[in-house]
Design a protein with these regions (language model features):
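Charged, structured surface patches that assemble and position nucleic-acid processing machinery
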Residues: 1-106, 110-115, 119-123, 158-238
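A short acidic/basic microdomain associated with nuclease active sites
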Residues: 118-141
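Short, solvent-exposed loop/turn segments at secondary-structure junctions
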Residues: 128, 151, 183
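Short His-Asn-centered micro-motif
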Residues: 131-132, 148, 178-180
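Conserved catalytic cores of phosphodiester-cleaving nucleases, focusing on short active-site segments
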Residues: 135-137, 141-154
Length: 238
């Protein structure tokens, strides 16, 4: 997952078949009523439909593209050692909701977040691999552990951080990667003539989400529960 990636409609139309082959290789069934299967439907035949897509259909297409691309790209970089963890993640994606505004107890989007985050790290030449609790980074001083948490409810931030603390403490040192996307303030598409406006709006959005809990984060950091926090947030823009 690199910056400024351009994906053609031709590539998107091939995504469902590629993902089906990956699931078959790992002996995983894709149910016809799953959100993952709906991602396939959004991408199939898109070359012939692209000029007649409504805005809601375009949004569904982009969300489907993101899920399928995360699976395909992560599959292309995993090692033999990571196959078991990868199999678990794609099983979660198939079994759970992928709707951004439909939080669940164990959301499939958190598995997508993990697949995206490890690609983000490897793109930046970090020696990262899928492993407990979610991602393991190889460093000169030993393994460094990352706990990935999608915040489905703002009421559960403390619980998620406490769980991450336990997971990291069992293994040594690490940090928490938080995904705040379920609480994005922009429904639909952010429209602007200046790309920088999107970045500034997202920065304000992330800061407003972080600020009310800053004291709690600081207390946990001061207690040595983990070494830091990263926050992911993004939106569709035109």
């Amino acid at each position: 997952m690199g910056p400024e990636v351009i994906i053609s409609y031709e590539q998107i139309e091939r995504f469902p078949d590629k993902v089906k082959l990956i699931y078959a290789e790992f002996d995983k069934v894709i149910r016809a009523d799953s959100d993952l299967h709906r991602c396939f439907k959004a991408c199939e035949g898109v070359i012939h439909r692209k000029n007649t897509l409504t805005l809601p259909e375009r949004i569904d297409l982009l969300q489907a593209q993101r899920v399928l691309e995360a699976i395909i790209n992560c599959y292309s970089i995993i090692t033999v050692e990571e196959r078991s963890a990868f199999k678990g993640l794609i099983a979660q994606i198939e079994a759970n909701s992928l709707a951004p505004k439909e939080p669940s107890g164990f959301d499939g989007l958190n598995a997508v977040f993990e697949l995206e985050y490890i690609q983000y790290l490897r793109h930046r030449k970090v020696k990262a691999k899928l492993g407990e609790p979610d991602i393991v980074v190889s460093t000169d001083f030993g393994n460094y552990h990352i706990a990935c948490k999608s915040i489905n409810s703002l009421k559960n931030i403390k619980r998620n951080l406490e769980k991450a603390t336990e997971q990291i403490a069992e293994r040594g040192f690490g940090f928490v990667a938080l995904n705040f996307e379920p609480h994005l303030y922009y429904d639909g598409v952010f429209t602007t003539d200046e790309p920088r406006e999107v970045m500034e709006a997202l920065d304000r959005n992330a800061s407003s989400l972080y600020k009310p809990y800053e004291g709690m984060f600081d207390d946990m950091l001061a207690a040595g529960n983990f070494d830091g926090i990263t926050i992911q947030i993004c939106c569709l823009a035109n």
